[in-house]
Amino acid sequence: MSDKIIENNQVTVIGEVMSEFVYSHEVFGEGFYMVDILVKRLSNSSDRIPVMVSERLVDVTEDYRGTCIMVSGQFRSYNRHEEQKNRLVLSVFAREIEFIDEEPDGAKTNHILLEGYMCKKPVYRKTPLGREIADLLLAVNRPYGKSDYIPCICWGRNARYASGFEVGEHV
């Protein structure tokens, strides 16, 4: 399974490590850790992206804060049960990590490809600044009967187009 490429869920992000590795859980003797990376947008804003990393990919006892890395893997979700409600937690599940000297300039450093099924009717709306957006909830299937539920936003003419998607439609 570790060699298998999942084609319906692929993500690559480049950013600066912002935290130490924090233990998350263990599966079949393999420890998994969370780390945050700061990823730049085209607008020069940044997002703090949580990344789940196997202890077999990198030395999780080292402090890599300030280091630039490229992470390739999948976008995953799970429900965290908090008191009276569930909270959808999103993260990148790292399959490969590469340490790079510096963040490259250019628009093509971060990308994501998701293929799945619409869970809810899209919500089309205009922001207070007049921008058209559509909120989507996409179910992306994984092996062994699991799925990741990924909220997505479409902008502009893509928002108008996506507003016509039906529940259960393959997108």
Q: Where are the model-predicted features located?
A:
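OB-fold and OB-like single-stranded nucleic-acid-recognition modules
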Residues: 1-171
